[in-house]
Amino acid sequence: MIQVREQYGNIYVRILDSQETFDYTLEKIRFIEGRTFNYETGEWMFGKESIGDLLLHFGNQIIWNQPLKEIIKNCDVNHELINKHLSWEDDDDFKTWTIKPYPYQKVGSHYLADRGKAAIFDGVGLGKTPQIIGACQILFNRNKARRVLIVTLNSLKRQWAKEIYKFAGEEAIAVYGSPAKRKKFIKGFASRSDIRYLVVNYETLRSAQYMKLIKEIPFDIVALDEAQKIKSGVTDKYLNIEPSLNAKACYDLKHIPYRFIATATPVQSKAEEVWSLFNFVDDSILGTWEVFRERYCKYSNRFGITGSFNLGELYYRIAPHFIRRTKEMPEIQQQLPKVQHSHVFLEMTDAQERIQDHLLMKMEEIKDTVRSLGSGTKVINGNLMNAQQAKEYYDGIIQGLQTFLIETCDAPQLLVHPEASQMSHNVISELGLSPKDIAKSPKLEQLKDFIKQLLNDEPSSKVVIFTEYERMARIIYEALPQSVLYTGQISDKEKDSVIERFREDPHTKFFISTRAGSTGLNLQVANYMVHFDLPYTATELEQRNGRIDRTGNAFSNITMYYYIMSESYDEHMLQLLFKKSELAKEILTGGVDKTSKGKDVNSLAMDRLLKKRAKSQGKMATG
């Protein structure tokens, strides 16, 4: 890989490779005429007329310090590859999009569409999803494709459907639910010509009954999101290696002509993982496993694969077939806004859905009880209460159930935590859920995946993570090495120590906090914030963001992530907080508050969820 900058009308090229690939890169540079070498800066110098040759030899393996259009400005350079590269940044293929992609995303989309079979390995937060959607849009526009199969993690299916609608304005069918419901979704997609995207998870492909239905649909494009799920795709009888179920299932989709993969963590220094990924993309890139093994793998019959070699050669074999950018690249930093807000919608587990439905049912029963209260006294739980006392008693129970709803979205295990109330323990007991049933937290899994990618891509980055609950903060703290914990339960001295360690220690990457850290702290050493759950007010949300979005932050771009469980209390809270935030802006700029007063966001979110549940049950009753 090379870095290119322009100065004083010349082009300066620096080789960024490790020793394994340096010689291959140097050999390519020596093919280009008119070069000189600057010993002081360690760069090769070319005239601008050599830009086309650089693109020819390095293509998507160039880091531009300035946008290409600026480099060739006021320069009479006419080269087919340059013109093609510049045309990739046009909006022609995205005229109907609600949200226009960034220039580097357009380049990524065109790269995928032009290659037809390729990989995108962009770093965290650069938008691999819109780039894949963009590649599909380009192929639609060229009449080369009509139907797309997206394969992703179970928790991200509805997130994909939302992203497709957000960018391209198209509906997508996400396959979820019971076996009968999943079959209905797939068959429904097959019978409709107005919907072009079907979104499934890897486990769905592993089912013979679903795969049979999917293979009957004439898909033109298949895209694997989080493609590291197929990194174990080797079949080797001599070494006694079997492919993973995910890889085996995905390889059955290689009849689909356009194939894309996306992941921020493509390989972990294992040559066999490279082969597994690119065997799906195009098996002609690296050939058969047996030939690949002899060329790149150290192995023995007793210990299996023990290492790799010839990695420089391997890199240049796959280089034309993938594109990778990170936020640390100057060209990317120039295109991104100072602050990005990204909502990550996750799929609820079966246990979470059952708990949420059970809690909503209890709330409805309590509300019915409150509505039936007369003006007289009642004996409740052995206590004599008047109507007002009874109402306050039931309001307290509802507030507790609201808390359980939020905790369920975060991690169901919070309901049976040693410090949890007997009422929350009873909820789990009433449903007959086992510790295994409630052990999984899609939010926590998403966070750990994000952290893994971040440490791989951006070792200098730091993250602030907020949650409303101390118990949740401790669970996150225990799951993340290199982290510090800031809560209202620690002393002032400990708080000062935690802040100093996060600011000063380069190895301390994650600051995990409850509401105690939402005001007054300067944490501008971080460039990412994760809202594990949402606060009750838009003001507090802005206060959280203000910990890193402040003067003095040395990072060019910072990103705020909001983790939201789809079709849950979370989602309703997000909608209401957004409306409240917009309202606050209107008031501050002279608008008038015409909305009703009284209920807080928490109560409104619960009311919305109850109404949605009642409506859903009404449909089921009449269906």
Annotate each language-model stretch with its function.
Residues 1-98:
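Accessory DNA-engaging acidic/polar modules
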Residues 77-111, 117, 126-247, 255, ...:
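SF2 helicase/translocase NTPase motor core
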Residues 120, 465:
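Hydrophobic anchor at the beta1->P-loop junction of P-loop NTPases
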Residues 124, 257-270:
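Conserved helicase ATPase motor motifs in RecA-like P-loop NTPase domains
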Residues 199-204, 209-218, 242-256, 262, ...:
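Inter-lobe coupling linker of SF2 helicases/translocases
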Residues 275-287:
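A short helix-turn-beta junction within AAA+ P-loop NTPase domains corresponding to the substrate/partner-engaging
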Residues 276, 522-534, 558-562:
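A short beta-strand element within the Helicase C-terminal
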Residues 538-558:
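Conserved SF2 helicase motif VI
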